[in-house]
Amino acid sequence: MGMSGHGMPAARWGAGTLLVLGALVGCSGGDGKPSAHAGASSTAAGPTKGPGDYRPPTALCPKVDFGPLTAAVAPTSGAPKGELTGSDPSTSSGAACLQAFRTTGTKADGRSTVYCSAWKDVPTAIKVYAYRLSSAPKEAQGAVVKESGLGVEAFRYQNVKDAAPFADDLRLVVRDSNMECEVQVQSLKPLTDQQVEAAWPAMAVTVRTLLPELRS
């Protein structure tokens, strides 16, 4: 299984990273401490059977609040852009929303992206999440950290696999029932330690406030 929960390689957006970067450049513009090291298996609480509580999202941008990430990382650049995701609607279907940001100057040099996919049932979502959790250490710089109190289960890490041309690539993956959401913060310029430390709880808040919107 070489696919992420949102039905596409996690670093891709539309036609590919380079095209996105071209679009970005053309625009103007918790405490974050480790709670535990991620293991190879998932120890999920909550229901493990049934179709789940979520239907596939179709328009994600109107539901995502990028305010916490804007305050933590950098000002936004331009309007958010959305698209549908999922290579097989009979298995998984979802949506994504990208918000460009600028750490310096007037040109966009980074992006915050939220992906959310509803899997066909809870067992499938659990299986995909467990696979992603077990694979994360191969992609991570430093520890893969499990997050408590966020959906049914969640983890975060700093990605280095296929991260180029980004200098920093922060990722948070959350499963709640049959829904999987991922927040990515990717910057062409290195983020400061302060920005990274502030980004983790902001990413968590983004998902925490989004999940109830996806249930409605």
Name what the model sees in each region.
Residues 16-24:
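Bacterial N-terminal signal peptides
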Residues 3-17:
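Bacterial N-terminal signal peptides that target proteins for export
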Residues 24-31:
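Bacterial signal peptide processing site
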Residues 31-216:
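A small/polar (G/S/T-enriched), proline-flanked helix-loop surface module common
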Residues 2-3, 216:
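Short, intrinsically disordered, low-complexity terminal/loop segments
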